[in-house]
Amino acid sequence: MKHYILFFISNILIENFILVKFLGLCPFLGASSNIETAFGMSCATTFVILTSSVLLWCVNFFILLPLDLIYLRIIAYMLIVSVSVQFLEIVLRKTSPILYRLLGIFLPLITTNCTVLAIPLFSLYEHHTFLESIFYGLSASLGFALVMIIFSCIRERIVLSDIPLPFQGAPIILITVSLISITFMGFKGLIKI
């Protein structure tokens, strides 16, 4: 159990996909203008990553490997992600129209989010078991959500601040992201896996 807890903490704080691996920057910068949108995007991304991780592991080990069709892994995975996102879009449209409108174009773009594409593939290439694959997907997506929500809170404060003209817009956003990244670097020596 200790292994899974360390695995969980490591993926959330130390090996964060946004701040360390620089994956998922498009939705991170685009959907983090307010806390509601960031939280909705985080929940949607977590759902898609978790379901995709589980389904890809099952498809890989029960269909692709036994039939020696490993070369179809990426195509199968794109299909799994597309179905997960489409299912999520239908559910959100019916249950939460406000969140559906807030997410706007970013909801279908989850399909091409490099974080969503990378996490299950990293899990497969690191030869995780089924349970490790679930933990990897959940912890990596929670790390994505944590950074996204923290950044959206800071970004809401930035809008209210008096920023010098040369730093308004993208410059202050990128400076803020770099400072958050430096903060998370403080966790680097915390866990050795």
UniProtKB/Swiss-Prot annotation:
<dbReference type="Pfam" id="PF02508">
    <property type="entry name" value="Rnf-Nqr"/>
</dbReference>
<feature type="transmembrane region" description="Helical">
    <location>
        <begin position="134"/>
        <end position="154"/>
    </location>
</feature>
<comment type="similarity">
    <text>Belongs to the NqrDE/RnfAE family.</text>
</comment>
<feature type="transmembrane region" description="Helical">
    <location>
        <begin position="47"/>
        <end position="67"/>
    </location>
</feature>
<comment type="function">
    <text>Part of a membrane-bound complex that couples electron transfer with translocation of ions across the membrane.</text>
</comment>
<feature type="transmembrane region" description="Helical">
    <location>
        <begin position="72"/>
        <end position="92"/>
    </location>
</feature>
<dbReference type="GO" id="GO:0022900">
    <property type="term" value="P:electron transport chain"/>
</dbReference>
<keyword id="KW-1278">Translocase</keyword>
<keyword id="KW-0249">Electron transport</keyword>
<protein>
    <recommendedName>
        <fullName>Ion-translocating oxidoreductase complex subunit A</fullName>
        <ecNumber>7.-.-.-</ecNumber>
    </recommendedName>
</protein>
<feature type="transmembrane region" description="Helical">
    <location>
        <begin position="5"/>
        <end position="25"/>
    </location>
</feature>
<feature type="transmembrane region" description="Helical">
    <location>
        <begin position="102"/>
        <end position="122"/>
    </location>
</feature>
<feature type="transmembrane region" description="Helical">
    <location>
        <begin position="167"/>
        <end position="187"/>
    </location>
</feature>
<keyword id="KW-1003">Cell membrane</keyword>
<comment type="subunit">
    <text>The complex is composed of six subunits: RnfA, RnfB, RnfC, RnfD, RnfE and RnfG.</text>
</comment>
<keyword id="KW-0812">Transmembrane</keyword>
<dbReference type="InterPro" id="IPR011293">
    <property type="entry name" value="Ion_transpt_RnfA/RsxA"/>
</dbReference>
<keyword id="KW-0813">Transport</keyword>
<keyword id="KW-0997">Cell inner membrane</keyword>
<dbReference type="InterPro" id="IPR050133">
    <property type="entry name" value="NqrDE/RnfAE_oxidrdctase"/>
</dbReference>
<dbReference type="GO" id="GO:0005886">
    <property type="term" value="C:plasma membrane"/>
</dbReference>
<dbReference type="InterPro" id="IPR003667">
    <property type="entry name" value="NqrDE/RnfAE"/>
</dbReference>
<keyword id="KW-1133">Transmembrane helix</keyword>
<keyword id="KW-0472">Membrane</keyword>
